[in-house]
Amino acid sequence: DTDMADLVLCKPTELYNILNQSTKFSRLAEPNYLCLLDARSKREYNESHIVTARRAKQDKDENYLLPESVELECVRYCVVYDGNTASLNETGPAIKCSRVVAQVYRYPVLVLEGGYERFSAYYHFFRSQKVFWMPQEIEEFLSYPIEIIPGLLYLGDQRQANDRHIHKDLKINAQVNVSLDPEKNLSSEVHNELHIPVMDSCDSDLLKFFSRACEFIDKHMGTNSAVLVFSKLGISCSSTVVIAYLIYCKKYFLKEAWTHVLTCKPNMRPNRGFVKQLSEWENIILGQQSTDIADPHY
């Protein structure tokens, strides 16, 4: 029998971020990246499900079957959801299905907290009726910015900053452009833009812009407006500003802020110069440098 330790609740924002990881292509195109299982009825699944989910099938006695054509032992994330399971103490479809999967899966099975109902209320644009995905269609799946503070703070790249649908879906009301190019196309329509003209080099001084960036983000988030921080690739410059903001607003030590952003976006990577500047910023905001940046982790 499986132990409950093999199941872990997964917040809607965590699944949203898993769905939106990308390198050159969406990570969803990697065969061993994500197995997303919908444990609801066939009728509910056909009506609408979370994008790329497959239906968990049952035998004639209503026992869940392992998904076919998925090598579960190799998959990095396995997420199971039903209509609205909200705790691991329930006995609904998501828990029953997860227990079957947990017998062969080597990591904890993630059970989506609040199920399809909560997820689709937050992220209506990730509802789908599509059942079969061709590999090329998944490769072309355009990822959305990563969510750092649910509904309020997003981290993205230039393409996402210029995508009208993304702005509308995430209700982006302000953005911070951390790159040398002032964007001419879409961001001129986003009236609230802060441009920080810095290039991704160890010699760039981003520290001198931290206060202005943090105050700008704070001002907009204070009115419950969503803010997108972006740079060309969304990996170094913009993630540095987001980490600086978490130190400023949440009073996180650099280590906590770093871990938070890394959990949301595992390929984020501020350059060495920016790491030193974040360490100075930690000292300015918190009055101490508690994070040892010589640690190879940074």
Regions inferred by a protein language model and the residue ranges of each:
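Thiolate-centered catalytic microenvironments shared by cysteine-dependent enzyme domains
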Residues: D1-V8, V51, A56-F141
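Conserved beta-strand elements of beta-rich interaction domains across eukaryotes
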Residues: L7, E14-N17, R40-E44, K60-D61, ...
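Local beta-strand N-terminus motif with an aromatic residue
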Residues: N32-L34, I50, V75, I172
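Structural scaffold elements adjacent to functional motifs in cytosolic proteins
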Residues: L36-D38, A53, Q175
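Short loop/helix-cap segments at secondary-structure boundaries that form the rim of catalytic
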Residues: E44-T52, H167, P182-H191
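PTP/DSP superfamily signal
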Residues: A102-L153, A161-N173, N177-S179, E183, ...
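Helix-loop module immediately N-terminal to the HCX5R catalytic loop
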Residues: S26, E30-P31, R54-V79, L194-L228
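Flexible, polar/low-complexity N-terminal or interdomain linker segments that lie immediately upstream
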Residues: D1-E47, E117, A121-I166
